[in-house]
Amino acid sequence: GDVYKRQALTEIPGSSSVLSRGFVTYSNQSKIDMLGVRLKTLELHGAVSGQTVSEMASGAITASNGEADYAIAVSGVAGPDGGNKEKPVGLVYICILKKGEVGEIKKYIFRGDRHSVRYQTVMKALDNLTQLV
């Protein structure tokens, strides 16, 4: 999802004035190393959870060294593999965080193939962001 979001944003002329940076953190270790997600959060709730995206968004704000006013964090099961009864393919958590405020976490279950789930995630994340800005 992160790559699609950056592509969607960077297609707009002048986007470099509003997009500071992005993080691709597929592995749990990268979430810990790059965004400061706590190991305990990952152990208790898993990578695909509201708690994890909340910590990811907070970590992105911190990692921006004061440059970012907003952070978008996404984690999900895009498929075709990786889903189970508790966390099916299509499950996505999105957190939009404004610096200094509590993040808004939303849970979605999207339908379709991997590309479709990722596309729907990007569109929903950007829609959620525009509602807050």
Describe each PLM feature range.
Residues 1:
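Oxyanion-binding "anion nests"
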Residues 5-133:
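Short alpha-helical segments enriched in small residues
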